[in-house]
């Protein structure tokens, strides 16, 4: 068994440590309507196509009940579309500030390429959003071989179509010769649905939801507890492996290749 390609997520995995770019915007568009949502609630659907993310938030029982209390009805599709349009407008303005590669990512990518491994990517951002992020990330030294957005396929995560399109464009098959790595539950489901080795990265992830400064300053026992919660969440949602930092990825690959593991 030889791994021939790795498909990376973007925000929270390779760029934007902690996946903070969309978080504040999701909270803001609800707050403007008098409906407060928590950071934990805002993060829960992370990884989905962003309009699906807005829709998922409106379907959470607490948020739906609060909306109904204020407006006398549940959120409509018109409400969802209006909030999404506001989300896009605000996000486009701030995205360039959230495209810096996470520490260690560029070095890992360089090492993978030295081994002849192809680098693909999927995202919950639209093509228009990714035009901004990918351009800025490239200026800072990170550019995968291929990028697929939900706009390029019939549906985004948790459907496997973005991974399949990467496989076709990169010329790699079968799917168990590829790894999908990401930082959200929807990433884990996407990878498993595509029949790929699926890896969850914890530090810098949306699921952990901490900035680099918070990680550095947190009590080690408290941080360890939070890391293990995220690790378990990834495993419960299909991860074959979890890693704390991207630097551990190659050791996972070696385990797969040397032990001739089989996807279950």
UniProtKB/Swiss-Prot annotation:
- GO BP: any one term: organic phosphonate catabolic process
Report the catalytic activity: phosphonoacetaldehyde + H2O = acetaldehyde + phosphate + H(+)
Please report which protein family the annotation says this sequence is part of: Belongs to the HAD-like hydrolase superfamily. PhnX family.
Q: Name a Pfam family for this protein.
A: Hydrolase
Co-factor(s): Mg(2+)
- According to the lineage, what is the superkingdom? Bacteria
Q: Among the entry's GO cellular component annotations, what is one?
A: cytosol
What's a Gene Ontology MF term here?
Answer: phosphoglycolate phosphatase activity
Q: What class of enzyme is it?
A: hydrolase
Which residues does the Swiss-Prot or TrEMBL record annotate as the active site?
9 (nucleophile), 50 (schiff-base intermediate with substrate)
| Gene source species | Bacillus cereus (strain AH820)
Could you say which residues bind Mg(2+) here?
Answer: 9, 11, 183
Return the cofactor note field.
Binds 1 Mg(2+) ion per subunit.
What the entry lists under InterPro entries is as follows: HAD-like_hydrolase_sf, HAD-like_sf, HAD-SF_hydro_IA, HAD_sf, PGP-like_dom2, Phosphonoacetald_hydro
Q: Does the keyword Transmembrane apply?
A: no
Name the UniProt key words of this record, in alphabetical order: Hydrolase, Magnesium, Metal-binding, Schiff base
- EC code(s) of this entry: 3.11.1.1
Please give the subunit comment from the record: Homodimer.
**UniProt-recorded name of the protein:** Phosphonoacetaldehyde hydrolase
Role played: Involved in phosphonate degradation.
Which cystines does this chain contain?
none
């Amino acid at each position: 068994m030889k791994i021939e390609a790795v498909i990376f997520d973007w925000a929270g995995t390779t760029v934007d440590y902690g996946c903070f770019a969309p978080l504040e915007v999701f909270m803001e568009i609800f707050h403007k309507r008098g409906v407060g949502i928590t950071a934990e609630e805002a993060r829960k659907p992370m990884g989905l196509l962003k309009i699906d993310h807005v829709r998922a938030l409106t379907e959470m029982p607490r948020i739906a009940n609060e909306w109904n209390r204020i407006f006398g009805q549940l959120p409509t599709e018109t409400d969802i579309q209006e909030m999404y349009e506001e989300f896009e407008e605000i996000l486009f303005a701030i995205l360039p500030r959230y495209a810096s590669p996470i520490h260690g990512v560029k070095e890992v990518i360089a090492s993978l390429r030295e081994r002849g491994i192809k680098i693909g990517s999927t995202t919950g951002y639209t093509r228009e959003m990714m035009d901004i992020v990918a351009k800025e990330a490239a200026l800072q030294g990170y550019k995968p071989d291929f990028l697929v957005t939900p706009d390029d396929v019939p549906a985004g995560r948790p459907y496997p179509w973005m991974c399949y399109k990467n496989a076709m464009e990169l010329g790699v098959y079968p799917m168990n010769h590829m790894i999908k790595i990401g930082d959200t539950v929807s990433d884990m489901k996407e990878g498993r649905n595509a029949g790929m080795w699926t890896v969850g990265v914890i530090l810098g992830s949306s699921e952990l939801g901490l900035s680099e400064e918070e990680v550095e300053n947190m009590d080690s026992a408290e941080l360890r507890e939070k890391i293990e919660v995220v690790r378990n969440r990834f495993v419960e949602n299909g991860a074959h492996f979890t890693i704390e930092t991207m630097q551990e990825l190659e050791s996972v690959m070696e385990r797969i290749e040397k032990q001739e593991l089989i996807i279950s």
